[in-house]
Amino acid sequence: MIKWLPYMIDITSLFIWLKSHSYQTAKASRWQLITILSAVAYMMIVSYLTLAPTSYAFVGNQQVAPMIIGSAPVNLIPFWSTTADFYQNVLMMMPMGIYIRLLLPYLKFEKVILTGVIISTGIEMLQFILDEWVGLSRWVDINDVLTNAFGFAFGWLIIVGLAHTPVKRIILPFVISLFSR
């Protein structure tokens, strides 16, 4: 049960954040509410995939012999192994890049890259800490940081690119300016 505590704290934090911003979300259109609620649901899924003690193996055996630091398996060598999780991480973070563009439309690309690296590094640091504290049994991998950041930036670039097409009419109602600056 203790292994689930970090995930439960994370989910509780998301709901507290949502409640604390309810005065702002009350001003949102129905399309903006869809953006906010789907972003929260997406964050819950990412939390589950990265911080919950799951027994799901989305990839086969790792091709890398990790360093063991404490009880955490750690890979600090970039691109040593490119298993299916390499591509899964890119796909997992693309929606986050899209949500960042919808929720914080004023962010410039450099800050988007930095935000993606910070979020990815934060996930890996949490996995390392939770491996030590509660035995989460997750790999800490530099490839995850790189591929997550790439997926984050790629998702942002997709929505920016679509904003320069006729699809902009569809995207615009979902953009939130409530949380900007």
Model-derived regions: residue spans:
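Non-cytosolic membrane-interface motifs at loop->transmembrane helix junctions
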Residues: 136-146
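Bulky hydrophobic segments
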Residues: 1-138, 156-181
